[in-house]
């Protein structure tokens, strides 16, 4: 068994707990027993002293009768001795006769009773003044009780106690190991289930029944982790498949065109036209690769933003000029309102707004209007892009930031690689981090609408600043957190 095993630790804790309880109980029992015996001895000595005093009163002035009656009283107790001293220190009476006054140099007094050990024996004594019926001064009486049997009893009790403690420790260690082993069986089952899981079985979950309450939180968290891993693994698999598909198309086009041209000799104009077509495909392929590299860098925090003061109205006007001809061809009007200044990375802002505008143009019907409004709230700037469009199906809401994700699972050709809304989280990696995305549930929703992915949808993207705004502009900086999606 490993020293660091949980079973061993629980067993040791069980042993320590049992040993501590037994020691506390043993020490308490020992002290209470000693106090009880001490009280019994003091009571016995007190009763004998009262009897001696009563005999002294009843014997009158006859010393011999007094001594005889004291002898009768004390002689029946072999473990009890008595010495009566006159005021000058000479003995008046002793029983047994050879009894001497005890030396109190090493004696201690507890509860009015003297206690000491001598030559391996233990004694307790009580002293008092005894008055005689005659006019003579009172005597000093010493009653000494031999309690060696008590000392032997407690010595035996201690031996038994330590023996029982040792046996109980060994037994509790064995029982503690069995109890811990049995109690940790659910953990072993969880471990076996976790060990049996692989990339192909991430959909399995550890059942919560029958599981102790202490492990429910752990298993719930573990199952949640499996869910996240399964989702991430599926997204990664789909991402890899989509990358292969997106890269295969331009490469296949290049190879096909080249094979056709090389099949026979052709005029220089044909070669020039083919090279131009190949260059177009290469540019598309380069754009896809650049986009993937950009997103990979953003995921790893390798993009360092260059914050400059930007006039949002100027940014919107510039992008409107870029998309003006496309909007005219589709019969869509572009409308901008409001103005505000912010500190942000111009490339990031252009990239995000351009992506949103292109998606809005793609899914806005002819004759409709795309509205971009800028609202300066003093401490934050709100950028809204509104366009009419169909409602997002709820099951797609959690996937709006997935790269290459499309509502229609069927693949389609086009110039877009599907990276779309994944540009919005890029702002998080670029330190412009508080971009809230609102998703309207229906056409009557009062939230503004915004297209943010390469599929028919409605979204609202609003960059908010948590920092302090300077006069005339709002700063988006390091203290801002999160790119959130909420319905």
UniProtKB/Swiss-Prot annotation:
Q: What is its EC number?
A: 2.7.13.3
Q: Which residues lie on this side of the membrane: Cytoplasmic?
A: 31-136, 181-487
Q: Which reaction does it catalyse?
A: ATP + protein L-histidine = ADP + protein N-phospho-L-histidine
InterPro entries referenced in this protein's UniProt entry, alphabetically = CusS-like_sensor, CztS_silS_copS, HAMP_dom, HATPase_C_sf, His_kinase_dom, HisK_dim/P_dom, HisK_dim/P_sf, TCS_sensor_his_kinase
Q: Where in the cell is it found?
A: Cell inner membrane
Positions the record marks as coiled coil are: none
Kindly give the Pfam families that the UniProt entry links to this protein.
CusS, HAMP, HATPase_c, HisKA
Domain (HAMP) ranges = 181-234
Identification of the protein by name: Sensor protein CopS
Q: Which gene encodes it?
A: copS
């Amino acid at each position: 068994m490993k020293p660091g095993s949980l079973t061993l630790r629980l067993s040791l804790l069980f042993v320590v707990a049992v040993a501590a309880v037994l020691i506390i109980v043993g020490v308490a029992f020992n002290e209470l027993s000693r106090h009880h015996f001490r009280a019994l001895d003091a009571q016995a000595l007190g009763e004998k002293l009262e009897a001696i005093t009563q005999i002294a009163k009843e014997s009158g002035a006859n010393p011999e009768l007094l001594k005889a009656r004291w002898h009768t009283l004390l002689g029946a107790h072999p473990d009890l001795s008595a010495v009566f001293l006159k005021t000058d220190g000479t003995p008046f009476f002793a029983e047994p006769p050879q009894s001497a006054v005890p030396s109190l140099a090493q004696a201690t007094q507890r509860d009015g009773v003297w206690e000491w050990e001598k030559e391996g024996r233990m004694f307790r004594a009580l002293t008092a003044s005894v008055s005689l019926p005659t006019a003579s001064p009172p005597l000093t009486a010493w009653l000494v009780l031999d309690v060696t049997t008590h000392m032997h009893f407690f010595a035996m009790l201690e031996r038994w106690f330590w023996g029982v403690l040792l046996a109980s420790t060994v037994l509790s260690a064995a029982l503690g190991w069995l109890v811990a082993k049995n109690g940790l069986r659910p953990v072993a089952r969880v471990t076996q289930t976790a060990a049996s899981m692989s990339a192909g079985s991430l959909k399995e979950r550890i059942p919560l029944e029958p599981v102790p309450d202490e492990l429910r939180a752990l298993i719930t968290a573990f199952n949640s982790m499996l869910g996240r891993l399964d989702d991430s693994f599926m997204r990664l698999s789909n991402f890899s498949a989509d990358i292969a598909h997106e890269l295969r198309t331009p490469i296949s086009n290049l190879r096909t065109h080249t094979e056709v041209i090389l099949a026979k000799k052709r005029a220089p104009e044909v070669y020039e036209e083919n090279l131009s077509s190949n260059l177009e495909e290469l540019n598309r392929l380069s754009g896809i690769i650049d986009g993937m590299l950009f997103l990979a860098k953003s995921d790893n925090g390798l993009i360092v933003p260059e914050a400059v003061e930007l006039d949002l109205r100027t940014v919107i006007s510039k992008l409107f000029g870029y998309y003006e001809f496309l909007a005219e061809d589709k019969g869509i009007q572009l409308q901008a309102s409001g103005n505000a200044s912010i500190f942000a990375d111009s490339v990031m802002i252009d990239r995000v707004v351009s992506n949103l505008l292109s998606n809005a143009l793609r899914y806005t019907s002819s004759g409709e209007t795309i509205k971009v409004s800028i609202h300066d709230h003093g401490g934050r700037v709100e950028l809204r892009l509104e366009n009419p469009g169909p409602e997002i199906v709820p099951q797609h809401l959690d996937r709006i930031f997935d790269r290459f994700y499309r509502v229609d699972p069927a693949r389609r050709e086009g110039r877009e690689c599907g990276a779309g809304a994944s540009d919005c989280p890029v702002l998080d990696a670029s330190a412009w981090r508080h971009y809230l995305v609102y998703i309207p549930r229906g056409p009557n929703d009062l939230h503004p609408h915004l297209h943010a992915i390469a599929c028919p949808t409605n979204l609202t993207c609003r960059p908010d600043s948590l920092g302090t705004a300077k006069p005339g502009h709002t700063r988006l900086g390091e203290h801002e957190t999160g790119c959130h999606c909420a319905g």
